[in-house]
């Protein structure tokens, strides 16, 4: 937790990487690029990658390259670049296994009310990042945070990722960021890619509006989010999961530089 808030300039922290681990070379390539970018901008950086995608619409959707293989790649990324790594878990028995390889355990939005899953993550002693459900009010997230703290684990963060707006769209209520900062008393992260999903497609493949990533990110920084979460890929069109709402890797540097400038203005007027 201290690392995430350690920027000498007061900058936000970043959780970023591919949606799912597709292979070692791909993971190391993305991590190397993001480490280079974030080090120049004084952004504390955490590599993100799912070792398995359990939440798929279609039975034939890609879920992963194998749990152990993907987890070993995540650990190698962390060791190679000396950075923390985050991955998500979906069942209680995954918590202890994943905790052997990564530094932060993430609870998916659809599972943010699952008490035993949250407790299992918290009891590993790892930091826990809980994504707010698309169906949940910001004011209710402190109950999920309380479950982590009840286990004696104070290292917790929450992530905003949009609210369901009808059957096939999401919107972001930016009031939720300061609301959760106040009620949860922990860092609040903005997921700037999943919040632009177009879920429940008739094809069974989630769509997105990636051209609005900069808009969502800028607004989140303007209201004082503590961290940014994003998924990125060299070529989102060939990504095996969630390519429709990823930010191309070659656009990350410019976006983060702009957001860093916005953060400087925010701090000037709030401190």
For each of these PLM feature ranges, what is it?
Residues 59-68, 104-111, 167-171, 195-222, ...:
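Active-site-adjacent loop and "lid" segments of alpha/beta metabolic enzymes
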Residues 14, 18-26, 45-67, 232-243:
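Glycine-rich, proline-tolerant flexible connector loops at the mouths of alpha/beta enzymes
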Residues 11-15, 44-48, 84-86, 103-104, ...:
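Structural preference for beta-strand elements that scaffold enzyme active sites
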Residues 5, 219-271:
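Structured C-terminal cap/extension of enzyme domains
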């Amino acid at each position: 937790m201290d690392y995430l808030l350690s920027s000498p300039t007061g900058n936000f922290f970043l959780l970023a990487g591919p949606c799912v681990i597709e292979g070692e070379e791909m993971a190391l390539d993305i991590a190397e690029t993001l480490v280079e970018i974030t080090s120049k901008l004084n952004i504390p950086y955490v590599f993100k990658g799912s070792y398995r995608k359990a939440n798929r619409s279609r039975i034939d959707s890609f879920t992963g390259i194998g749990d152990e293989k993907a987890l070993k790649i995540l650990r190698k990324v962390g060791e190679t670049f000396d950075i923390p790594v985050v991955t998500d878990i979906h069942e209680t028995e995954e918590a202890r296994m994943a905790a052997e390889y990564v530094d932060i355990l993430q609870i998916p939005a659809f599972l943010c009310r699952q008490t035993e899953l949250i407790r299992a993550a918290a009891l590993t002693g790892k930091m826990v990042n809980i994504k707010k459900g698309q169906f949940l009010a910001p004011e209710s997230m402190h109950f999920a945070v309380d479950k982590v703290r009840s286990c004696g684990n104070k290292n917790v963060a929450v992530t905003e990722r949009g609210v369901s707006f009808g059957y096939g769209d999401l919107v972001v209520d930016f009031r939720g960021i300061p609301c959760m900062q106040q009620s949860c008393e922990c860092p609040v992260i903005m997921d700037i890619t999943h919040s632009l999903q177009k879920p429940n497609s008739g094809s069974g493949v989630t769509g997105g509006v990636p051209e609005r990533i900069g808009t969502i990110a800028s607004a989140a920084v303007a209201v004082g989010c503590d961290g940014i979460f994003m998924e990125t890929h060299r070529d989102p069109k060939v990504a095996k999961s969630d390519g429709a709402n990823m930010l191309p890797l070659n656009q990350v540097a410019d976006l983060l530089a702009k957001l860093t400038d916005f953060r400087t203005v925010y701090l000037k007027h709030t401190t």
